[in-house]
């Protein structure tokens, strides 16, 4: 029996041999394109595995989404806190290290890739601005989600109470296991949260004599955005762990060096008026 990852926040789409997830909330906006790709159809956006396969994957997903692959903008991601504004689909980002893109232009589709890190999609339906953010644990510590939101507020006049933030499939606290050094980084940066919420769970049994901890990065990102003024009801989580579902979703933790990359795409389409 084929598995279906649909839940109250996500819909699992199967079309022309390709499978992807979409946020139900974002489907309420007819000019908005959104998706998180799955493995099915041999989709893999990791250029190091195969540049040709990555390009084929873009062609495939654009075909089922009815999106022009020539208006895809994809940055060179390096776990930074750098967020750039995009004004043209032909904009050359070069080899600059960028982990977040924002735009208020139509017919520009922002594509970022993931293999356990949290995809954060931002949408301001009032000012028609979007963002696509790559927030791994390093990006979370650097508060890239908050920085991208602040940049949308500055560039487009977005108000936090109007912004919708969607967290795509990512490694859950159930599998995001770290040692003392990384745990301390989170405690030092987010002490105000860790004292109040169960963001860090200490494992009861040592592994090879080493104390391990499990961290909830999604909760940190949520609390950071709520603190900025986003409404809790407008922060929507997929509820899907990439490691738990590594048969359908690329995962670095599960697949190790053979890992592939999933893609998150967000864009606003220019629809013809009838």
Region roles according to the model:
Residues 1-274:
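Active-site microenvironment for binding and transforming phosphate-containing groups
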